[in-house]
Design a protein with these regions (language model features):
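Active-site neighborhoods and metal-handling regions in enzymes and metal-associated proteins
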Residues: 1-416
Length: 416
């Protein structure tokens, strides 16, 4: 949480932290500015003191809404500095930072964070090391200050996540109702029984994705990563987004993975349901029941303070007890259980904590954390895959709550 930033600075022995970027491209900037639209800002944080937001004069009104101390970037005008340095923009950015830190009396260990192309970031950090005589430039690769702070959410963040969850679940409910309302046509000329669109033509994945988009517009949601609506063998490849030309055939496994956020950015929701229209093949039904059993087992055993990697091991061992291959004993397998169980969720679709079972993963389940639970089985050669995914919140009392109330029924009824 934001209230932990001073503690995290102290734990890292940092005298200050500098964050660069824009609300739209840097989750850390969005986090610190409460999502107010700002571009190309510099944020200076020092223990026990208000944060300083250095911003373009054109954005002074939005900057004032953040509650931070504000300063106009023209006080350290980058163009003027670049002219002094004969047009060397890299040297100018480093010199601008030197002047800012000097004016605020910052010296010692300073961590640098934000967003940028890797080459540009490396060049700037290297130049800063050369330019900042009184500063030790500190960078973090894993579990950095703000990644760690964002693992736990405060009441305002949870309210935002509940809000986007409600809207996302409304979209999924509307889609399920639409699919169930469509009549089915008997197969002909080699095609199988499938749903019909309102114009009497076959309903396709393209139609479904357009419907999802329209529902998102109504709910004020956007899908920066698209969505997954994959049928049959495509559902057997976890991140296959689906073939737009595919017909909505009865009895085929459908994986619908939906991960929207509010228009303009904000907190994500992430949910997956597996459906079969009208009826389900026995093999799909069995895989679904086994996956539902894993999901319930994980939910029943969630515990504050327990290593997150333990839940990946629990999942693999349960699936293996049912003779499914998993990545625990068959690394690289493309059938069976092939991915991680869960991931943190927030301003990014994948964030800390990690639930992967590797030696260096020391993450534990924490109060205030929000994460997915998403076991699944994949058999592209057999023409199906199944996955079930909810978003889970651990409250301050250590109780766990699903933020994804939409039913987990495999079968979607269709009109006769």
């Amino acid at each position: 949480m934001k209230r932990d930033i001073d503690r995290l600075l102290a734990e890292r022995n940092l005298d200050a932290a500098v964050v660069r970027g824009s609300t739209l491209d840097s989750p850390t900037v969005r986090y610190l500015t409460d999502g107010h639209k700002l571009e190309g800002v510099i944020i200076l944080l020092r223990p026990g003191r208000p944060g300083v937001l250095i911003h373009n004069p054109m954005e002074r009104d939005d900057a004032a809404l953040t509650g931070m101390e504000t300063a106009l970037s023209t006080r350290w005008d980058l163009r003027s500095i670049a002219n002094e340095l004969h047009g060397d923009l890299l040297a100018a950015q480093a010199e601008q930072m030197r002047r800012i830190l000097a004016d605020y009396g910052v010296a010692g260990r300073v961590g640098f964070y934000g967003h940028g192309e890797i080459g540009q970031a490396h060049a700037l950090l290297s130049k800063l090391e050369q330019t900042l005589a009184d500063v030790d430039v500190v960078v973090e690769f894993k579990d950095d200050l703000f990644t760690t702070a964002r693992i736990t959410k405060d009441e305002g963040e949870i309210a935002a996540m509940r809000d986007v969850a409600g809207r996302a679940n409304a979209v999924v409910a509307a889609l399920a109702d639409m699919l169930s309302s469509r009549p089915a046509a008997n197969g002909s000329r080699g095609s199988k029984a499938h749903l019909l669109a309102p114009d009497g033509q076959p309903l396709t994945v393209r139609h479904v994705k357009q419907f999802i988009h329209e529902q998102c517009v109504q709910q004020g949601l956007e899908q920066p990563g698209g969505n997954i609506f994959a049928l049959g063998a495509d559902a057997g490849v976890p991140h296959n987004q689906g073939n737009p030309a595919d017909l909505l055939e009865l009895g085929k496994a459908i994986i619908f993975d939906f991960f929207p956020r509010p228009v303009g950015g904000g907190y994500f929701h992430d949910m997956t349901r597996t459906w079969c229209l009208g009826h389900a093949p026995k093999e799909v039904e069995r895989a679904y029941q086994d996956t539902m059993a894993v999901f319930n087992l994980v939910m029943e055993t969630l515990e504050v303070g327990k290593r997150t990697s333990a839940y990946q091991s629990i999942t693999c061992k349960y699936y293996e007890s049912l003779n499914y291959p998993t990545i625990l004993t068959a690394p690289g397998t493309q059938v069976g259980y092939v991915h991680g169980l869960a991931h943190g969720l927030g301003l990014e679709i994948h964030e800390a904590p990690s639930f992967h079972a590797y030696e260096g993963n020391m993450a534990v389940v924490e109060r205030g954390s929000v994460f997915t639970v998403e076991p699944g089985l994949y058999f592209p050669d057999k023409g199906y895959g199944v996955r079930i995914e909810d978003v889970v919140y651990c409250d301050e009392a250590g109780a766990f709550h699903s933020l994804t109330p939409f039913p987990k029924d495999l079968l979607l009824p269709v009109r006769k």
